[in-house]
Amino acid sequence: INLGFNSEIGFANTKARLRMITLYQVAASSNGLVVGTGNKVEDFGVGFFTKYGDGGVDISPIADLTKSEVKSIARELKISQKIIMAEPTDGLWDDNRNDEQQLGLSYEEIEKAMFDENSINRKKYLDIRKNNIHKMNAIPVCIINKKIKSN
């Protein structure tokens, strides 16, 4: 019986969730926290993370910083240029595709589109965001009618 469990995106998201489980085990073993690496552009601009995967963290110290702000701070901290300029990738795909290949826009293009309504990439940015907005919103709670609850 083929149940159709051959979704490429499903396998990639499973890898991200297994990473999260591993990070929480390490954190629990060391009485620590899982620290998020998502920034304002990636996580809250376009929602480019796996729900209950790399989005599952205890604290997000750079979530209010854009990608360009993170790079600027990294330069101030004298972080290696090789690290600052490294190609963004989630490492979840067998073909080693990078974030830009997955999103269809670079982070520079996304950042510009986020803040410039006249950006040539504004529509594409908004489309990506619309598809992922469910990850950025609180989980919907079903309110049960009191009459039903009391039965």
Identify the function of each model-found stretch.
Residues 1-17, 21-24, 28-33, 37-41, ...:
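ATP/NTP-dependent adenylation/nucleotidyl-transfer catalytic domains that generate, transfer
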